[in-house]
């Protein structure tokens, strides 16, 4: 009877390409030194990436670590739940519910335009008082280990889409923060509010930001957006938002700009997320 370890290494590698990654790393790698060494070979993880469609053979961009690349591709998905209002306001925390409060409408809506992606059918709409909603993403609960987050520090790509009504001006707000296990803010993206005047083209606009080279210790992501109309009209005339996303991805930028971080020596900037809508100073 032939021992499996007597098979040529290329045959063993081919067998391993069909074994799920968790079993390879948690079980197979512990069997013997031969299996451990083969499972650590980058060729195996490149083959698995090709087999599962994470990459094509004609890829020009180099990959530093195929195992990390494969793991990140396996986990990659939108970490925000109900981004397109298909489940009304489910999964969102309402931080501010001004005017006539948040509402869900179907595209294109009154005095609106179609969304670029035809699969998106609905949007959230704000009113004449400030409307803000948010989600908190727990990265460990989503499958990202502390070691992966702290040593690899993969890119965190945040995107949001917003649009005004053609007949009413509005102001749109976005805030995204990376926080530690105890909710200390380590990096943030909070662009100036976008104000759009009345009698506009009602077009959908995308806003995007990539967190790269952020400090170690990131465990949570706070995503908050919303706004209000600028004319204080009763009803739902404020900015419309939909198709929001947070995706953790393999770093692709060759020289990515570092994330905006809060310096440790500046204790006045060390803030803790107490709730999705309020902040507390942690300095003595």
Swiss-Prot record:
Location, primary (coarse class):
cytoplasm
Q: List the disulfide bonds.
A: none
Q: Which residues carry this modification: Phosphoserine?
A: 249, 268, 275, 278, 283
Pfam families recorded: F-box-like, FBA
* Compartment(s): Cytoplasm
| FBA domain span | 69-250
Tell me the keywords, alphabetical order.
Answer: Cytoplasm, DNA damage, DNA repair, Phosphoprotein, Ubl conjugation pathway, Unfolded protein response
CDD domains per record: F-box_FBXO6-like (cd22168)
Which domain of life does the protein's organism represent?
Eukaryota
Keyword Cytoplasm attached: yes
Q: Which residues form the F-box domain?
A: 1-48
Question: Would you tell me the Gene Ontology cellular component terms?
Answer: cytoplasm; endoplasmic reticulum quality control compartment; SCF ubiquitin ligase complex
User: Annotated pathway, please?
Assistant: Protein modification; protein ubiquitination
Gene Ontology biological-process annotations? DNA repair; ERAD pathway; glycoprotein catabolic process; protein ubiquitination; response to unfolded protein; SCF-dependent proteasomal ubiquitin-dependent protein catabolic process; ubiquitin-dependent protein catabolic process
What does this protein do, in the record's words? Answer: Substrate-recognition component of some SCF (SKP1-CUL1-F-box protein)-type E3 ubiquitin ligase complexes. Involved in endoplasmic reticulum-associated degradation pathway (ERAD) for misfolded lumenal proteins by recognizing and binding sugar chains on unfolded glycoproteins that are retrotranslocated into the cytosol and promoting their ubiquitination and subsequent degradation. Able to recognize and bind denatured glycoproteins, which are modified with not only high-mannose but also complex-type oligosaccharides. Also recognizes sulfated glycans.
Tell me how this protein assembles: Part of a SCF (SKP1-cullin-F-box) protein ligase complex. Interacts with VCP, CHEK1 and CUL1.
Q: What's the protein name? A: F-box only protein 6
Q: Which organism is it from?
A: Rattus norvegicus
Q: What taxonomic lineage is listed for the species of origin?
A: Eukaryota, Metazoa, Chordata, Craniata, Vertebrata
